[in-house]
């Protein structure tokens, strides 16, 4: 029995091959994370030239700050809305395209197009559509007697950023769901139909369990996307307003760290956000993965 493990002539060659990736990880991930941990227990001046060790004081001030707690709850609500609706809509579209025989390539192309749009551009696009004075969608809403102004209404502002974020992420989810659906053997689906199972029953009892690994992967990816990668959308669409109703944790870190030059507070918020994402990921792997069928 032969081993498939590669054998290197030089003992140092494997380390040289891994070195570039290790350097990238250390420089762009481990070193910034270590700096954030260090700054979170320091009281830094606005330019970072002098510091004083304060222990957990920065964290205590954060959890006694009602504005920070509001942004914490806003982040949780926003993230679950983006991840939930993004995955449901993508799965629905993928199932429709997988079912359609004619012009399926055209539908795939149209659905994938938003993936090529930059997040800030996606936000501006939806801002124009929902512009209170010139927007096409707001014009039809006005005909129905509904007044739209996301610059003054917190609920409308949240709807706008969730809509733009979901629209931007649909293409990514769609590609994975469609590939998973097309990998299911047609013989299994046909056998279920012969046994008398209807389309809905076949989907929930046969198709959905078979694509559960992809669904679990996308759940993790979408939550991380909602926590971090939606910053350009929020910044371009609402800038965290009105009255901080769309200020998520990542945007609050930017506002206090880069705009307000409060490096200690922003570092403490970065640590909390990092721990929150790690905690949610561990929970998903600990409990949600149990229901994933890899067979």
Curated annotation (Swiss-Prot):
Function: Part of the ABC transporter complex UgpBAEC involved in sn-glycerol-3-phosphate (G3P) import. Probably responsible for the translocation of the substrate across the membrane.
Species lineage: Bacteria, Pseudomonadati, Pseudomonadota, Gammaproteobacteria, Enterobacterales
Family statement: Belongs to the binding-protein-dependent transport system permease family. UgpAE subfamily.
Protein name per UniProt: sn-glycerol-3-phosphate transport system permease protein UgpA
Assembly: The complex is composed of two ATP-binding proteins (UgpC), two transmembrane proteins (UgpA and UgpE) and a solute-binding protein (UgpB).
Cited PROSITE patterns: ABC_TM1
Residue ranges annotated for the ABC transmembrane type-1 domain, each copy included: 76-284
Predominant subcellular localization, coarse grouping: membrane
Lineage top rank: taxon: Bacteria
Segments in the Cytoplasmic topological domain: 1-11, 98-109, 179-207, 284-295
UniProt-annotated location(s): Cell inner membrane
Any one GO cellular component localisation term in the record: plasma membrane
Organism: Pectobacterium atrosepticum (strain SCRI 1043 / ATCC BAA-672)
Protein's gene: ugpA
Topology of this chain in the membrane: Multi-pass membrane protein
Biological process (GO), any one: transmembrane transport
Keyword Membrane: yes
Keyword RNA-binding found: no
Spans within the Periplasmic topological domain: 33-76, 131-157, 229-262
Ranges annotated as spanning the membrane: 12-32, 77-97, 110-130, 158-178, 208-228, 263-283
Keyword terms: Cell inner membrane, Cell membrane, Membrane, Transmembrane, Transmembrane helix, Transport
């Amino acid at each position: 029995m032969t081993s498939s493990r590669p054998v290197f002539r030089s003992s140092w060659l494997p380390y040289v091959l891994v070195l570039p990736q290790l350097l990238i990880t250390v420089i762009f991930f481990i070193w910034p994370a270590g700096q954030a941990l260090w700054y979170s227990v320091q009281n830094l001046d606005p330019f970072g030239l002098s510091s004083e060790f304060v222990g957990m004081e920065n964290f205590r001030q954060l959890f006694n700050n009602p504005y920070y707690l509001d942004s914490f709850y806003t982040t949780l609500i926003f993230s679950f809305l983006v991840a939930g609706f993004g995955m449901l809509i993508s799965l629905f579209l993928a199932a429709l395209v997988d079912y359609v025989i004619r012009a399926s390539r055209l539908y795939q192309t149209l659905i994938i197009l938003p993936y090529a749009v930059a997040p800030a551009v996606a936000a501006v696009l939806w801002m124009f559509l929902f512009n209170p004075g010139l927007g096409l969608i707001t014009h039809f809403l006005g005909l129905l007697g509904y007044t739209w102004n996301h610059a003054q209404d917190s609920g409308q502002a949240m709807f706008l950023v969730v809509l733009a974020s979901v629209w931007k992420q649909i293409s990514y989810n769609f590609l994975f769901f469609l590939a998973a659906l097309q990998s299911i053997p047609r013989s299994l689906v046909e056998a279920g139909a012969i046994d008398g199972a209807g389309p809905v029953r076949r989907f929930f009892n046969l198709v959905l369990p078979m694509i559960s690994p992809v669904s679990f992967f996308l759940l993790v990816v979408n939550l991380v996307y909602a926590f971090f990668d939606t910053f350009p959308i929020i910044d371009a669409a609402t800038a965290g307003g009105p009255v901080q109703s769309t200020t998520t944790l990542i945007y609050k870190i930017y506002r206090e760290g880069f705009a307000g030059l409060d490096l200690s507070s922003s570092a403490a918020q970065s640590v909390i956000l990092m721990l929150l994402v790690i905690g949610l990921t561990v929970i998903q792997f600990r409990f949600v993965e149990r229901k994933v069928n890899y067979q």
